[in-house]
């Protein structure tokens, strides 16, 4: 275990230890070539940012914000801010002008760092409406800054405020030469000494599924406690190569990336989530945090290949998965030693067929893969373990600085649970089976939201999560968001997320919103995976002029109904989807139907598609 460092000096302490070893793997904006940055280079850039922020007039506990996708400069900026006790606030790269204006005003942001052209254009337009905002700093050098914008500068020019000459760092002598040229480094080091665990590190704005935006306050003390608590059960280390899939705005990715850096692992910065599988095949990571939807898509793709395979090849694939499931689920997950004949059979299939599946994903050197953020289908979880990948299922919130509970690598676990609570997190089940939390990693509250804070914490200091769940044999099981639970007109309770996760394993389903509240039966709005559906239509001679016509075709509806019925076989009658509508377009953030983390805003969907929903309940 590494020596724990305050985030303000973490990168510099690691540079002393690891020097010229690669710390970050990344691609420059617009480039397809992967490059690396050493710990020494990382440290120097962070110091330059710290010096530049002081020269811009930033004072301790004032705020900057980063409005960008994952990139190298994002990390430089965050850790540079921590070095001078400045609060760094991440904005989702997809945020609207209205959202960023609200957050800038609420937090009093002084400097806004932006990524690409789209983010700069939004920032430029709202700048006159944000009286606290002094400057815009642009990461991507190809961005066209308006000729009428005296307030924006490129990141390279920003760095020159921290040091007159931005050179590359090749060795220790370069490091000393550049550091000697940092104009305010002595002040930076004084601020390192003043840094404390009560300082605000980040404010993370969560829009939530109900649309109300609130800033979660995260302190250095919370990060410190989270690093210690996670280190016991999440064994990332110096030899790991950790790829980023989720945006750094997401607390799961942020906390996970900081844990990896704390342990001396190398970070692989993936900028575009849509290119993650290509990035994995090119960089061969050992670890990655993700949401279940990533693994659902992997499962669907592998399942489709098996279905398309010929007789003997298909049988071999199916046998390999069956053996992998028996070995990893029936024995290892329960802490039991597999019998010798099963060990031998698994070794054979693992070295041949299962290793090919992992190679296709770029995961030949796989270590483990934390997964959280939504319900994981048992079918998908079993599949991931069956192909020989260690999925660590967990549960957490922004308010808990990510992890509340997780599986422990090498220890028994139960499919369907979200693991065991971390040692320093106290979990209690309250009224309506609500999960309550208390501990050092839990937020002190929401920024400027005193009334909301009074509601969120009870008199004993427990934070009310709004999630329903239960504890069994020391493991935590999730039921549903309490606000999302539907009650049919017949008095039956429906958990929409659980039902949706069952259908999302089908290769024809891209998005689904279950409808049931105060209705006499369950229905659903389903967005098909159009590429797969259109290919199916062509193969079966089904002509269509557009997606709307395709979605209404009786043959398509019959095929989808049969697939849904198959997936629902083990469910109670009242839980089953009785009617559904295929949607000719996706649910979107632009229409307010999805959060920035792509979760459904059910109330908006129900409002936007009221007529479509009502039609499903007509006699």
Q: Can you say where each PLM-predicted feature lies in the sequence?
A:
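Conserved AMP-binding/adenylation subdomain of ANL enzymes
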Residues: 224-241, 248-351, 355, 365
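Conserved ATP-dependent adenylate/AMP-binding module captured primarily in the ANL superfamily
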Residues: 95-125, 226-243, 273-287, 360
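Conserved C-terminal "lid"/linker of ANL adenylate-forming enzymes
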Residues: 486, 511-514, 520, 561-619
